[in-house]
Amino acid sequence: MGNKPTIAISHLGCEKNRIDSEHMLGLLAKAGYPVDNDEELADYVIVNTCSFIQAAREESVRTLVELAEANKKIIISGCMAQHFQDELLTELPEAVAIVGTGDYQKIVEIVERVETGERVKEVSADPTFIADENLPRYRTTSEGVAYLRVAEGCDYRCAFCIIPQLRGDQRSRSIESIVAEARQLASQGVQELILISQITTNYGLDLYGEPKLAELLRALGEVDIPWIRVHYAYPTGLTPKVIEAIRETPNVLPYLDLPLQHSHPDILRGMNRPWQGRVNDGIIERIKQAIPNAVLRTTFIVGFPGETEEHFSHLLEFVKRHEFDHVGVFTFSAEEGTAAFDLPDPVPQAIMDERRERLMLTQQPISERKNQAYIGQTVDVLIEQENPETGELIGRSARFSPEVDGLVYVTGEAILGAIVQVRITAADTYDLYGEIV
């Protein structure tokens, strides 16, 4: 057999997609394929696409078109491949393979088939696969950080979301499998482990007959990783048992990412959120009472069909009242195939944009005040980057999650991937500044 082709991966989308990319890289490297970051040098480029909202699809399409114009052989994977498999094969002659969200583990066999001249479509109609600790993985995050998927898919059917159609129903890994992978990552020097799934608080429901996040967190408390962070916690799943496990497990950070999406009962019912119209106030107060140092991040959607100025004002007051640490705001994106696609009373884009701006302006002074409260304190910071020109270090404190929250800019010397103590000397709306002590 001759030399194997060089392969690059262009990763788009969420951290769940990132893990799929990392497994494909790991499988290809294990099979002896040269893997390169430089798409220009690669014989094949795998584009792991996102199809969550229109803007994400547009980014995926731009990437595909650029590669096609450069005459690259393209393997399209991810949510867009699952969503538009036939259209992509028709529109992009450069696409030599389409790989579904439940089929990335077959990537070596797919490349082998493509090499014989076959045009491959490997897309399971109903994805059921979930990778475990035995599937090779090549991490693409900074040295100190790793994402760990505890479950794949979703059993909820929120009106605005197409993800269950693209990634299938929920399937959880066993506690033993997750802990085994966490130990592997600890042995690689990982300092921060971020637990992800579509709904992390529902972890284990399909496997054990009841959610087992509390038990999982306590088991991960035995693993030698200083920071364990939970993403995508639904408020309904933050039971006293889960809150207690967060409070009592020293390496589980008191950081909760709560995708609330709205506050008004009418809009929550329209969205078909799992807690329907039950307002979130009580749950948030319970978290703050049980974990006084809890860091709360949330996301909201403005402009859902039927959202009136009264509904939006309710959301503004909700944000003022609860003073979240971090808030992300999206404008509604009508997705074909979802229940919300053709709902009456659409909100004009200009009004959506204006509401997003107003909500962000409401949150910014809250975020800035919370950041400024850290001035003079000494906090642990995970160092992730160094500016080669200035020598300035860039990292995150425990209250900042990667990609979505702020950064800590640090003067002093430290090893990348290490957690060091930093005295905070300044703060702005999103970031902190300090010096190593």
UniProtKB/Swiss-Prot annotation:
Residues 5-116 form the MTTase N-terminal domain. Keywords: 4Fe-4S, Cytoplasm, Iron, Iron-sulfur, Metal-binding, S-adenosyl-L-methionine, Transferase. Its EC number is 2.8.4.4. Residues 140-369 form the Radical SAM core domain. GO terms for molecular function: 4 iron, 4 sulfur cluster binding; aspartic acid methylthiotransferase activity; metal ion binding; protein methylthiotransferase activity. Disulfide bonds: none annotated. [4Fe-4S] cluster 1 binds at C14, C50, C79. [4Fe-4S] cluster 2 binds at C154, C158, C161. Residues 372-437 form the TRAM domain. GO terms for cellular component: cytosol. Signal peptide: none annotated. InterPro entries: Elp3/MiaA/NifB-like_rSAM, Methylthiotransferase, Methylthiotransferase_CS, Methylthiotransferase_N, Methylthiotransferase_N_sf, NA-bd_OB-fold, Ribosomal_uS12_MeSTrfase_RimO, rSAM. It is found in: Cytoplasm. Binds 2 [4Fe-4S] clusters. One cluster is coordinated with 3 cysteines and an exchangeable S-adenosyl-L-methionine. GO terms for biological process: tRNA modification. It catalyses: L-aspartate(89)-[ribosomal protein uS12]-hydrogen + (sulfur carrier)-SH + AH2 + 2 S-adenosyl-L-methionine = 3-methylsulfanyl-L-aspartate(89)-[ribosomal protein uS12]-hydrogen + (sulfur carrier)-H + 5'-deoxyadenosine + L-methionine + A + S-adenosyl-L-homocysteine + 2 H(+). It is an enzyme of class 2 (transferase). Its cofactor is [4Fe-4S] cluster. Catalyzes the methylthiolation of an aspartic acid residue of ribosomal protein uS12. NCBIfam families: 30S ribosomal protein S12 methylthiotransferase RimO, MiaB/RimO family radical SAM methylthiotransferase. Belongs to the methylthiotransferase family. RimO subfamily. HAMAP family: MTTase_RimO (MF_01865). This is Ribosomal protein uS12 methylthiotransferase RimO. It comes from Microcystis aeruginosa (strain NIES-843 / IAM M-2473). The gene is rimO.
